Amino acid sequence: MVVELVFRILLGGSYFQDKQSKLSDDRAKGYMTNSDLEKAVKEFGRRCSNISRIYSIGKSVHGVPLWVIEISDKPGEEEPEPAFKFVGNVHGDEPVGRELLLRLANWICDNYIKDSLARLIVENIHLHILPSMNPDGYFLRRRGNANNIDLNRDFPDQFFPVNNDINARQPETRAVMNWLREMQFAGSASLHGGALVANYPWDGTEDKRRNYYACPDDDTFRFMASIYSHSHHNMSLSTEFPGGITNGALWYPIYGGMQDWNYIHAGCFELTLEISDNKWPNANEIPTLWEYNKMSLLNLAASLVKTGIHGRIFSSDSGMPLPGSITIKGINYTKLVADGVNIYHGKQIIVLFLPCIKKSLKSM
C-alpha cells in the first residue's frame, strides 16, 4: 500500500492525467467519434442524395475535414431562395449539438415527403449543417481547438480586434470566414451547452461593462430567439432569462465571437443557442434533448420562408442579374444585390437602388 502511494506520488501529473483521460473516455461513451461522424455524414449523403450534397469547408489543425451537409431540393444550385446554417461543436467539450444536427438532417430526409414543415424547408431553403466546427477539441475533450484556442473568441471583433487579418486566425475560424465569403446566408445558429437560453447580439460592449447592448436589428433578433425558445420544451419558462432569451452583452460580454462577426461582416443573422444545462450530458439523454429541441430547430430554419425578403433582380430584356443595392430605412444597412438578396429584418421599409435605372426608388 505504501509502495503504491509512493509510486503514485512520483508519477504525479501522469497519474492524474491518466485518471482524467479515463473519466473523459467514460463521458464520451455513446457519442459519435470523429470517425463515426464522418461515416454518418457520408452515409447520409448516399441515403439522401436526391435532396443533399456533402462538402467540406476546410480542415482542423490536425487535418480533420469540416464536413457540411446541404439540404435542398436543388442542392448545390444557385436559386432565389434563402440559405440558413447550423453550426455545432464550436467548443470541443460541448458535443450535444453535433449529435442533434445529424438527427435533424436524418429527420428531414425521412419526413420531407409526408411532413409539411420538412417539405417547406427542403423546397424553399438551402439548409447547411456543419455538425462539428471543432473536431480536434472534441477529440481532446476540451473547449479549445488543438492549439487550445477558444474558437468563439477568435473572430475579428468590432471593439477589440486582436488582428483583423484572416491569415492570423485558427484554421477552423478561417474556414468559417471563407465559407461566408463564398456563400450568402440569411440566418444562422450555433449550438452550445452549459445553459438553456437563446442568445442574440450584441455579444460585447465598447466599455466592457455588462449591460443590454442592442444591435440595429434588435427587434428581429428578439423575434428569432423567441421562435426558438417558445418552440422548445421548456426554454421559454426560464426563471433566469425572461422568455428564455437574452442579449449577449447583458448576460456576459465576450469579444471575438462568431455571432457578431456573422452579422457585421456577412449580413447573416446568427443566434447562439445554449441547448443543454450540462455541457456534456450522458449519451442516454440525447434522445430527450432531441425531442426538446427538434421543433425549435425546424421552426427557426422555416422562419426564413415565413418572414423576410429573398430573391434576385434580373433585366427583363437580357435575363441577366442587375447590379444594385438595397437600403433599409431607419437601419444603417445597405446590401449589394447582384448575386441575389436574402434579407431578414422584420417589418421595414426597403429602398431598392439600381444605378442603371433613373427611377429606382421602390418601397416594400
Q: What residue spans do the PLM features occupy?
A:
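A short, solvent-exposed loop/turn motif at the edges and junctions
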Residues: 350-364
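Short glycine- and acidic-rich boundary segments immediately preceding or forming the N-terminal edge
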Residues: 10-65
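Short, Gly/Ser/Thr-enriched beta-strand-loop segments that form substrate-interacting elements
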Residues: 55, 241-264
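A short, amphipathic beta-strand motif
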Residues: 309-316
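Short, acidic Ser/Thr/Gly-rich low-complexity loop/linker segments typical of extracellular
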Residues: 322-349
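Short, surface-exposed beta-strand/loop micro-motifs that present aromatic residues
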Residues: 66-76, 258-264
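Active-site/substrate-binding loop(s) of hydrolase catalytic cores
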Residues: 78-226, 230-239, 262-263, 270-275
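Beta-strand-rich domain onsets/edges
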Residues: 281, 286-308
